[in-house]
Amino acid sequence: MPKRILQGVVVSDKSDKTVVVKVERRYSHPLLKKTVRQSKKYKAHDENNQFKIGDQISIQESKPISKDKRWIVVKDSVA
């Protein structure tokens, strides 16, 4: 099974080797017939502490690194 890759924005970099990434998705609401935005925050492993708040990055699924971290930073995505 291929690993999922998501794109998002770094909203926190306070933890060592960890960034919090906000991923936003859009979908059509079945009853209201309008586009709805929904966001979720993921903790991702940043080995070199190189990403700062506001950076656009891509994260990829991985094996569990800690209690909450199951994603790793793959690359800096330019939007």
From Swiss-Prot:
- Record CDD domains: Ribosomal_uS17
Subunit description: Part of the 30S ribosomal subunit.
Q: Name one GO biological process term.
A: translation
Gene from which this protein is expressed? rpsQ
- Is Amino-acid biosynthesis a UniProt keyword of this protein? no
**NCBIfam families linked to this entry:** PRK05610.1 (NF004123), uS17_bact (TIGR03635)
Highest taxon above the source species: Bacteria
MF (Gene Ontology): rRNA binding; structural constituent of ribosome
The root-end lineage is:
Bacteria, Pseudomonadati, Pseudomonadota, Alphaproteobacteria, Hyphomicrobiales
Q: Which HAMAP family match?
A: Ribosomal_uS17_B (MF_01345_B)
UniProt-listed SUPFAM superfamilies: Nucleic acid-binding proteins (SSF50249)
Q: Which InterPro entries match?
A: NA-bd_OB-fold (IPR012340), Ribosomal_uS17 (IPR000266), Ribosomal_uS17_bact/chlr (IPR019984), Ribosomal_uS17_CS (IPR019979)
Provide the protein name: Small ribosomal subunit protein uS17
Which Gene3D superfamilies does the UniProt record give? Nucleic acid-binding proteins (2.40.50.140)
Q: What does this protein do?
A: One of the primary rRNA binding proteins, it binds specifically to the 5'-end of 16S ribosomal RNA.
